[in-house]
From Swiss-Prot:
Gene (name only): atpD
Organism expressing this protein natively: Acidovorax ebreus (strain TPSY) (Diaphorobacter sp. (strain TPSY))
Statement: the UniProt record of this protein carries the keyword Heme: no
Complexes and interactors: F-type ATPases have 2 components, CF(1) - the catalytic core - and CF(0) - the membrane proton channel. CF(1) has five subunits: alpha(3), beta(3), gamma(1), delta(1), epsilon(1). CF(0) has three main subunits: a(1), b(2) and c(9-12). The alpha and beta chains form an alternating ring which encloses part of the gamma chain. CF(1) is attached to CF(0) by a central stalk formed by the gamma and epsilon chains, while a peripheral stalk is formed by the delta and b chains.
Any one GO cellular component localisation term in the record: proton-transporting ATP synthase complex
Protein name: ATP synthase subunit beta
Membrane protein topology class: Peripheral membrane protein
Pfam families: ATP-synt_ab, ATP-synt_ab_N, ATP-synt_VA_C
Coiled coil: none
EC number: 7.1.2.2
Function: Produces ATP from ADP in the presence of a proton gradient across the membrane. The catalytic sites are hosted primarily by the beta subunits.
Length: 468
């Protein structure tokens, strides 16, 4: 069948209206190709009289009325499977790493339905991260969804990189990294770090363990809106082969923001705080596809920017509903110099249940949170009256809470170049043992600075000898 042609009748920024013969209008989400140009347009609305409204997936510089456009008759398709490993691609699956074309023999549409209810497979298995605060108070589930929430500059990307370092390297499966509207520099750093660690095998790309899809800050909103779907499509194809996949998204907020820009360009009425009226539906459509089936699993870790540190903002609030574990990064904790700046009282996990993690882990985590909560309540009294006015048992709580707070810090492998101290991976059993000793009072004689930036509790004892 001959491909149908239309012509551009209006261009307003990234929004392009194209006129087709009335009886041959493209369907919503069909990809249109501009003649003599690599630019792709995606149909968003049918306006009637043969005119469709599209979003340009690329720069619309130089577009003018009258240019011819061809309807491909299908949604955007991208290469999937082994050919994507070790490669960096854009939203359309074109390589941007200057290492030759990507094999297109296996492709998939970026718009797909979520798996049916009877295909889903819930998981109770824990995923050890080697980061004490996460393993203790908000453990991750294999095949679960995790959100890293935080404002600007509290360490979302560094935490994400450490998780990739600890899980992706130890994890024998494959990873997909979607850079959605983030800094190009970070994407470049990530690629080189993966190459240095051997996760990307530059000699033999097929032996690599990660596929990367980037739609950076400087790209048009259409690219940033669809790049998460491109990454997800690659992850789904690996899952459907029966593999366990790690899917990293940095940053899911930029996906929402791109949706807001596209919505405004299409002339939709904004809803609360200027977000698109379809915010919940767009987020749901993406998140429902990130799931584990009886064939394979997708474990997803998503960084979520929190505008103005307000967790009630519609964008992070909508994301919360879809997650199994939430890791909340706090500016107050970062200000104390405690990294990772995870708030152990705000962070939650569905896995923190005695039937999943075991009675000992559950009790230790709750005792740690209880001690920190009591310290939080006493801080106002300490600020006004000082430590001397506290009851002896409260003084003990404060001393233990400060030790716990410092023991929750940990040197990261990916931050070695900044801190100069080697990174530490702490097994879950050691994490539980360490915190159990602190809450039981076995470390009451140690100075609190001995607990700062160490791995296991044994290192704290060693450090205490040097401090003394």
């Amino acid at each position: 069948m001959a491909q149908v042609q239309g012509k551009i009748v209006q261009c307003i920024g990234a929004v392009v209206d194209v006129e087709f013969p009335r009886d041959q209008m493209p369907k919503v989400y069909d990809a249109l190709k501009l003649e003599g140009s690599p630019l792709t347009l995606e149909v968003q609305q049918q306006l009637g009289d043969g005119v469709v409204r599209t979003i340009a997936l690329g720069s619309s510089d130089g577009l003018k009325r009258g240019l011819m456009v061809t309807n491909t008759g299908n949604p955007i398709t991208v290469p999937v499977g082994k050919a994507t490993l070790g490669r960096i691609m854009d939203v359309l699956g074109n390589p941007i790493d200057e290492r030759g074309p990507v094999d297109q023999s296996l492709t998939a549409s970026i718009h797909r339905k979520a798996p049916a209810y009877d295909e889903l497979s819930p998981s109770q298995e824990l995923l050890e991260t080697g980061i004490k605060v996460i393993d203790l108070v908000c453990p991750f589930a294999k095949g679960g969804k995790v959100g890293l929430f935080g404002g600007a500059g509290v360490g979302k990307t560094v935490n994400m990189m450490e998780l990739i370092n600890n899980i992706a390297k130890a994890h024998s499966g494959l990873s997909v990294f979607a850079g959605v509207g983030e800094r190009t520099r970070e994407g470049n750093d990530f690629y080189h770090e993966m190459a240095d660690s051997g996760v990307v095998n530059l000699e033999n790309l097929g032996e690599s363990k990660v596929a990367m899809v980037y739609g950076q800050m400087n790209e048009p909103p259409g690219n940033r809106l669809r790049v998460a779907l491109t990454g997800l499509t690659i992850a789904e194809s690996f899952r459907d082969e029966g593999r366990d996949v790690l899917f990293f998204v940095d940053n899911i907020y930029r996906y929402t923001l791109a949706g807001t820009e596209v919505s405004a360009l299409l002339g939709r009425m904004p809803s609360a705080v200027g977000y698109q009226p379809t915010l919940a539906e767009e987020m749901g459509r993406l998140q429902e596809r990130i799931t584990s089936t009886k064939v394979g699993s997708i474990t997803s870790i998503q960084a979520v920017y929190v505008p103005a540190d307000d967790l009630t903002d519609p964008s992070p609030a909508t994301t919360f509903a879809h997650l199994d574990s939430t890791v909340v990064l706090s500016r107050d904790i970062a200000a104390l110099g405690i990294y990772p700046a995870v708030d152990p009282l705000d962070s939650t996990s569905r896995q923190l249940d005695p039937q999943v993690v075991g009675e000992e882990h559950y009790q230790v985590a709750r005792q740690v949170q209880g001690t920190l909560q009591r310290y939080k309540e006493l801080r106002d009294i300490i600020a006004i009256l000082g430590m001397d006015e506290l009851a002896p048992e409260d003084k003990l709580v404060v001393a233990r809470a400060r030790k716990i707070q410092r023991f929750l810090s940990q040197p990261f492998h990916v931050a070695e170049v900044f801190t100069g101290s080697p990174g530490k991976y702490v097994p879950l059993s050691e994490t539980i043992r360490g915190f159990k000793m602190i809450v039981a009072g076995e470390c009451d004689h140690l100075p609190e600075q001995a607990f700062y930036m160490v791995g296991t509790i044994d290192e704290a004892f060693e450090k205490a000898k040097k401090v003394a």
